[in-house]
Amino acid sequence: MSVIFSGIQPSGTITLGNYLGAMKQFTELQNEHDCYFCIVNQHAITVPQDPVQLRKNIRSLAALYVACGIDPEKATLFVQSEVPAHAQLGWIMQSVAYVGELERMTQYKDKASGRDSVPAGLLTYPPLMAADILLYNTEIVPVGDDQKQHMELTRDLAERFNKRFREVFTIPEIRIPKVGARVMSLTEPTKKMSKSDPNPKSMISMLDEPKTIEKKIKSAVTDSEGIVKFDKENKPGISNLLTIYSSFSGKTVEEIEAMYEGKGYGDFKGDLAQVVVEAIRPIQDKYNELINSPELDEILDKGAEKANRVAFKQLRKVENAMGLSRKRR
């Protein structure tokens, strides 16, 4: 049974892209693997956060994890800040990382571009991410392809530590799903769908009302050709919608293309909206049951307890290898 770790920031709503790129596959992975699913709230504070809203976002994300099918009897669901070893190992991994390689991270360059003042946390985000993963002897990390560079750095840092001190860390493998790994914006289909996009029409939230979902899909940018065909380079808009349809329906892109041969985008978009609405309806129902229930707190308490046991043990191995731990007389 392989160990799997994955984390999502509680920085606003969860999009269709988050669900298809990560959460949907989690429900399958938990049946065959030892899974740790972490709400990485310490990563969220690398940008300014309102304390009240952040607290709400953490709880909302936890409820969505369970509503999407995460079973606390099979997987460990917890909040990053409730396991102190994450921040402790994050500092240690900063001492292993080099400033140059951190500055080369694409996400850092994108977020720091054009800013007069750049929080140090944006630069040191990857070592903390590495710590998140390495604390649990993680073997597989399911991520969207936009996180591939950070994962490669995690592997580099783990190998560097193992060579410099001793073999402590398991080198994690990257798993990127074939379909739905990168859901694009509905308004600018050459960009990733993002919860931070200022245009609300660009993304679908997992908590959007059915009518809102229908409006967003029907207004999604396509092209003037009117043929439902996958062509990422020349038809990025319709290709993105085909990816979403395929991910929710279980049908291949080719099967969907055949279904809409001779039909226009209007029919396709209308049907896609219904597919999405029906797929996320039970998730929304379960979310509403959980969000204010003591059951959710019990799940998070239990998850933090288990994560702390495992993480503390690994942190002690790291400290022993580095000579940080005190030998008692």
From Swiss-Prot:
GO biological process, one term: tryptophanyl-tRNA aminoacylation
Enzyme kind, highest EC tier: ligase
Subunit relationships: Homodimer.
EC number(s) on file: 6.1.1.2
Span of the annotated motif 'KMSKS' region: 192-196
Matching SUPFAM superfamilies: Nucleotidylyl transferase
Family assignment from sequence similarity: Belongs to the class-I aminoacyl-tRNA synthetase family.
Extent of motif 'HIGH' region: 10-18
Name of the protein: Tryptophan--tRNA ligase
Residues engaged in binding ATP: 9-11, 17-18, 144-146, 183, 192-196
Residues that bind L-tryptophan: 132
CDD domains: TrpRS_core
Keyword Nucleotide-binding assigned: yes
Record field: catalytic activity: tRNA(Trp) + L-tryptophan + ATP = L-tryptophyl-tRNA(Trp) + AMP + diphosphate + H(+)
UniProt KW keywords: Aminoacyl-tRNA synthetase, ATP-binding, Cytoplasm, Ligase, Nucleotide-binding, Protein biosynthesis
Compartments where located: Cytoplasm
Protein task: Catalyzes the attachment of tryptophan to tRNA(Trp).
One GO MF term attached to the UniProt entry: tryptophan-tRNA ligase activity
One GO CC term, this protein: cytosol
Cytoplasm listed as a keyword: yes
Domain of life: Bacteria
Species: Bacillus anthracis
